């Protein structure tokens, strides 16, 4: 079946057109264009300092855009206030999981998101239990967040994001702190998700296993 360009654009949850971002007069990102929809797993690869994290923050309205266009669910977003209504539908895991862990326990942390979405307490904790099981980290549920290893924090942060049922998932260097076994576990999990994912990474094996599309910065 062939869709018109208008139909394809409507199906894009995220569309970036000719995006340019500068800092202190230096170009960080130049003329970048891509779309995200369906179950696409789009990888952004590049060396440290190439702008991968900057791009993810720009997609949430946290970094100003010099030129170009960001569309979320068909709406052009230019100012910070334009992005605000969509942040509840976009899940992000930061490179440093400590930036988004609120604790005190792992179970409490994962339930925090649904509670913040006004989900009743009993249901929020049930959702948290489901995500613990889904990610295979039920054994951690009563652990204090600050006692976790780097890899355990990564999976806890991801469980917390998935508990809020995002429509788009953004992951910034998600294999940082993971050994080979847990990288394989993460790969299998992401492959099963039925939502579009944008992933920044310089882990070539991880990229090769998962990517449906790759862009380089």
Swiss-Prot record:
One of its GO terms (cellular component) is ATP-binding cassette (ABC) transporter complex. CDD domains: ABC_cobalt_CbiO_domain1 (cd03225). Gene3D superfamilies: P-loop containing nucleotide triphosphate hydrolases (3.40.50.300). One of its GO terms (molecular function) is ATP hydrolysis activity. It comes from the Bacteria. Residues 14-217 form the ABC transporter domain. Keywords: ATP-binding, Nucleotide-binding, Transport. ATP binds at residues 46-53. PANTHER family: ENERGY-COUPLING FACTOR TRANSPORTER ATP-BINDING PROTEIN ECFA1, HEAVY METAL TRANSPORTER. Belongs to the ABC transporter superfamily. This is Uncharacterized ABC transporter ATP-binding protein HI_1618. It comes from Haemophilus influenzae (strain ATCC 51907 / DSM 11121 / KW20 / Rd).
């Amino acid at each position: 079946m062939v869709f018109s360009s208008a139909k394809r654009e409507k199906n894009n949850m995220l569309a970036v057109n000719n995006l340019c971002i500068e800092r202190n007069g230096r170009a960080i990102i130049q003329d970048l264009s891509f779309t995200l929809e369906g179950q696409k797993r789009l990888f952004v690869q590049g060396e440290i300092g190439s702008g991968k994290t900057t791009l993810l923050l720009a997609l949430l309205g946290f970094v100003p855009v010099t030129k170009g266009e960001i569309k979320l669910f068909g709406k052009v977003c230019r100012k910070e206030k334009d992005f605000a209504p969509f942040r509840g539908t976009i899940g992000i895991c930061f490179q440093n999981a400590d930036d988004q862990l609120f604790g005190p326990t792992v179970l409490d942390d994962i339930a925090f998101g649904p509670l913040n979405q006004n989900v009743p307490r009993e249901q929020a904790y049930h959702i948290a239990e489901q995500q613990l099981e889904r990610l295979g980290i039920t054994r951690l549920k009563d652990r204090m967040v600050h006692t976790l290893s780097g890899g355990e924090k990564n999976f806890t942060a991801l469980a917390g994001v998935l508990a809020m049922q995002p429509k788009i998932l953004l992951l910034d260097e998600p294999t940082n702190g993971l050994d080979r076994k847990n990288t394989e576990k993460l790969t299998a999990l992401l492959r099963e998700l039925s939502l579009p994912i944008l992933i920044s990474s310089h882990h070539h094996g991880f990229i090769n296993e998962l990517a449906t599309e790759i862009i380089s910065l």
